[in-house]
Amino acid sequence: MAMPPKLRNKLSAAVVGLILAGASAPVILDQFLDEKEGNSLTAYRDGGGLWTICRGATMVDGKPVVQGMRLTQSKCEQVNAKERDKVLAWVERNIKVSLTEPQKAGIASFCPYNIGPGKCFPSTFYKRINAGDRNGACEAIRWWIKDGGRDCRLTKGQKNGCYGQVERRDQESALTCWGIDQ
């Protein structure tokens, strides 16, 4: 089964341009995470209530992010690079099939970066990708659309909804399956 064009079209022109130019996984992932996470120099609570900063980091220099924490742009760039490299290394260690650069970026965003390794290891996605079922793995990414038990598909257009999670899963799936239909 080929990836539906509508999923590929959900990626930004910037991300698609990087892929078509042959960019590395770190470059693709940086662009994608900048688009999805933003980059806050001031600590804020994420959707789960955790204090985070930069592109969602919960720790800086081994210390937890706390209310009122502020960082410079330069420091956030360092934190973001460290987090990016950490999740890409996780993909290299834990995904047993060969991957293209966009596929590495998609998996890194979904598994270690967004849902966390603890939820990833027992997931259908993880089992399918490592069994070589790439289409099945990409389908399984799109199942992760609940936030606190709430189905995010039902929140489109709502203030304080979580519909962005549905879009993100579609985009992560598109990256993870980039090129398998060729």
Please give the residue ranges for each predicted region.
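Short, conserved catalytic/metal-binding motifs centered on acidic residues
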Residues: 33, 53, 107
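Mid-length scaffold segments of soluble, non-membrane domains
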Residues: 69-123
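Long, amphipathic alpha-helical surface segments
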Residues: 2-15, 19, 26-48, 60, ...
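Acidic/histidine-rich, surface-exposed loop or edge segments in extracytoplasmic proteins
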Residues: 55-73
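Secreted/periplasmic proteins that engage bacterial cell-wall peptidoglycan
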Residues: 47, 52-61, 81-84, 88, ...
